[in-house]
Design a protein with these regions (language model features):
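C-terminal accessory extensions appended to soluble enzyme cores
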Residues: 93, 161-228
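Electropositive, glycine- and tryptophan-enriched low-complexity nucleic-acid-binding patches
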Residues: 41-104, 109
Length: 228
């Protein structure tokens, strides 16, 4: 993993990013620990939240840039790739020289390399945007080394001791956190995502012909090349 990351960071036409979803935030007057300068009354149980928001983050380690998408639906394979596509639409003019995206991610249930819908959506992404995607997964119990995890710790400390009693409050705290002196770009995602979407075995076999898996480590390192 270190070799792949270092090679990506040293290659002019390659951009490395880290993607992950934070734990879902329950909206309501709930205690979240931490301290506040003012007295805040909070419920000590978080039953029946008014809504939920799951922050999905895309972090550029070499540029210290963070993008957060507040998702109000399920974080599915489709959701993750939609966030990736929305991010790329907003930045690709800046990165017109980039031909490869190296993506650091953990081996979660919605984004592992055997997740059929995730892989199909990434193949579609590569075909549409004409940019190669290299997936570099952290193995089990090592997701804490995924660079974006450090950002989630900062965000958690930033809003601890406060009441996240509305979606707007969650987004406002996300916008005012800082990473190396910079605020993240924050968007709200209100699309509805269905769970359990998957391909048939035959359809996935066709997708596999468009993937290049590293021998002996095919679950952890996958290239999706731009078709000729």
């Amino acid at each position: 993993m270190n070799r792949i990351n270092q090679a990506a960071d040293a290659t002019e036409d390659t951009l490395r990013l880290s993607i992950d979803a934070k734990a879902t935030v329950k909206i309501g007057p709930f205690s979240r620990g931490g301290k506040s300068r003012i007295q805040v009354a909070a419920a000590d149980h978080d039953f029946a939240p008014e809504a939920t928001v799951t922050p999905v983050g895309i972090f550029l380690p070499t540029l210290a840039e963070l993008f957060i998408y507040g998702v109000t639906s399920h974080v599915t394979s489709d959701c993750l790739v939609d966030c990736l596509a929305q991010w790329w639409e907003t930045v690709r003019a800046r990165f017109s020289h980039i031909t490869t995206l190296v993506v650091n991610l953990d081996n979660g249930p919605e984004n592992h390399s055997r997740r059929t819908q995730f892989m199909q959506r990434l193949v579609d992404f590569v075909r549409h945007y004409r940019v190669t995607v290299r997936l570099a997964y952290y193995p089990p119990y090592h997701s804490k080394y995924n660079p974006i995890e450090r950002c989630w710790g900062i965000l958690e400390n930033h809003w601890n001791g406060t009441l996240l009693d509305s979606i707007d409050a969650v987004l406002a705290f996300a916008r005012t956190m800082t990473w190396q002196g910079r605020h993240p770009v924050v968007h709200l995602v209100t699309a509805t995502y269905e769970t359990g979407v998957k391909l048939t075995k035959d359809a996935m076999q066709q997708i596999e012909t468009q993937l290049q898996r590293l021998p002996a480590l095919g679950k952890w390192f996958v290239d999706i090349m731009v078709p000729v």
